[in-house]
From Swiss-Prot:
It comes from the Bacteria. It holds the Pfam family ABC_tran. It comes from Rhodococcus jostii (strain RHA1). ATP binds at G42, E43, N44, G45, A46, G47, K48, S49. This is Ribose import ATP-binding protein RbsA. Keywords: ATP-binding, Cell membrane, Membrane, Nucleotide-binding, Repeat, Sugar transport, Translocase, Transport. Gene3D superfamilies: P-loop containing nucleotide triphosphate hydrolases. Part of the ABC transporter complex RbsABC involved in ribose import. Responsible for energy coupling to the transport system. One of its GO terms (cellular component) is plasma membrane. The keyword Mitochondrion does not apply.
Length: 503
């Protein structure tokens, strides 16, 4: 790595921030150098979001200082941060949908023609120049409504460049992106670094951190643990720094001899979505559905569970066919579905933790048609305790929990039904590494107890670390089946993309 310049573009120096009696950040320091991508990592609650809000001008530090180009500055508002060349790109951008791309980029700074009118021609020309600089084609006259998350993020980056930002903070930007969209974003980030900007990258995905970044800062419990070059570090090194202990294994897979066939899917088809899907899952087996976004993985299992329709095919649990289009029939047969979007599909965010954890057993817990709080609370306590769910009060709204603890509540809800088939769709998306290991442990333990598990995952390390078999889907069809010993990243990606025949 080349030697960075002596003066960083931005430096966080010994900052502290508390909210009431809770210290969110304590004595954190790190530099951001021009020409580098710098990862900021830590478990949920480590203080990363507070640091981002400091840099964005939302919160000021209680003590310590922020320096831009070696000069101490006060970022009392987002406009102060913008004036100092700092821009934050969030996971879910907030563009104005009824304005054009160019209007979103230059809102508040539109070029003016004579008589003070907005010069739309000049604005569109300037927007095109920004996208040319980023190396991405985009029509500046298009409305922002309907843009993908990936394209919205590029508009936000173009907006940052339009204000001469040279410190770009990317806060979990890849969580909702496909593989191709991630690579395009990385290409843009690398071009920003090549032009002398500093990029701060926040992500739970280690493969992305190692692919993009040159330096990493680790936080734990609001404190600075280390800042170092990534070269020579391993994922295990980062995990140990982040969680303060050796996780033993991020993928604590328990080897189990599979039992009898529990789930059978035969010739399942839905026009335009998936076709002729057939596979079996045995007791104690974890079968992963892998493939690119849009391959039809989630749709197949939602159809099998009865949430989505199917045109033809059969779904059997322990040899008994299920009535199609009936989640109730699937549940009675012993199936459970942990959906991809836990906030929209798996939880009722305004409802309490205890009520969410017992939703699947409301009828069983009721007496004479009424649900009494004591029985509900005991059941919720039992399952949230088993899953080591962290919360202040079990009566709190589930929406206040971290992503990892929300996922545990969804799992608790289904584990309380004693399922024989568990479908988990992107089970660790958006949760920190320590909680990922806990979720993996839960899934592995369930399999060891005889549950047949179908895991849909876009994270290849998770697929390879947890699955006994891997079924690869492409364009709505299963194109490859790989045993645990056969599967590797190359074979899965070749099959998923159709670029080469997989074994």
């Amino acid at each position: 790595m080349s030697v960075p310049p002596a003066v960083p573009l931005l430096e966080v120096r010994d900052v502290t921030k508390s909210f009431g009696n809770v210290a969110a950040v304590q004595g954190v320091s790190f530099p951001l150098y021009g020409g580098e991508a710098h990862a900021l990592v830590g478990e949920n609650g480590a203080g990363k979001s507070t640091i981002v809000k400091m840099l964005a001008g939302v919160h000021g530090p209680d003590t310590g200082s922020l320096l831009v180009g070696g000069e101490e500055v006060s970022l009392g508002s987002p406009s102060d941060a913008k004036a100092r060349g700092i821009a934050v790109i969030y996971q879910e951008p907030t563009l104005f949908p009824d304005l054009t791309i160019a209007e979103n980029i230059f809102i508040g700074t539109q070029p003016r023609a004579r008589l003070g009118m907005i010069d739309r021609s000049a604005m569109n020309t300037a927007a095109r120049a920004l996208f040319d600089r980023l190396g991405v084609p985009m029509d500046p006259d298009r409305l922002a409504s309907g843009l993908s998350i990936a394209d919205q993020q590029l508009v936000e980056i173009a907006k940052a460049l339009s204000t001469d930002a040279n410190v770009i903070v990317m806060d979990e930007p890849t969580a909702a992106l496909s593989g191709n969209e991630v690579e395009r974003l990385f290409k843009v980030a690398r071009s920003l670094c090549a032009s002398g900007s500093a990029v701060m990258f926040i992500s739970h995905r280690f493969e992305e951190i190692f692919a993009l970044c040159q330096r990493v800062t680790v936080m734990r419990d609001g404190r600075h643990i280390s800042t170092s070059e990534l070269a020579g570090l391993t994922v295990d090194d980062l995990v140990r720094s982040m969680v303060g202990r050796d996780l033993g294994a991020l993928f604590p897979k328990i080897d189990v001899e599979p039992g009898a066939v529990v789930l059978e899917i035969e010739n399942l088809s839905r026009a335009g979505v998936f076709s002729d899907i057939s596979f079996q899952v045995r007791a104690g087996e974890i079968v992963a559905l892998s493939g690119l976004v849009g391959a039809g993985r989630s749709e197949v299992m939602q159809s099998a569970f009865g949430v989505d329709p199917r045109d033809s095919g059969d779904v059997r649990v322990r040899g008994k066919s299920l009535r199609k289009g009936s989640p109730k029939a699937a549940m009675r047969a012993g199936m459970a579905l942990v959906p991809e979007d836990r906030r929209q599909q798996g939880l009722i965010l305004d409802m309490s933790i205890e009520r969410n954890a017992t939703l699947t057993r409301s009828s069983a817990l009721a007496r004479f048609g009424f649900l009494f709080g004591g029985r509900e609370r005991r059941s919720a306590y039992e399952w949230t305790k088993k899953l080591q769910t962290k919360y202040a009060r079990i009566t709190d709204p589930v929406g206040v929990l971290s992503g990892g603890n929300q996922q545990k509540v969804v799992l608790a809800k289904w584990m309380a039904t004693a399922p024989s088939v568990l479908i988990v769709d992107e089970p660790t998306r958006g949760i920190d590494v320590g909680t990922k290991a806990e979720v993996h442990r839960i899934i592995s333990t369930l399999a060891s107890e005889g549950v047949a598990v179908v895991m849909i995952s876009s994270e290849l390390p998770e697929v390879l670390g947890m699955a006994d078999r891997v079924l690869v889907m492409r364009e709505g069809r299963i194109v490859s089946e790989l045993s645990r010993s056969e599967a590797d990243e190359e074979k899965i990606m070749f099959a998923a993309t159709g670029s080469e025949a997989a074994a």
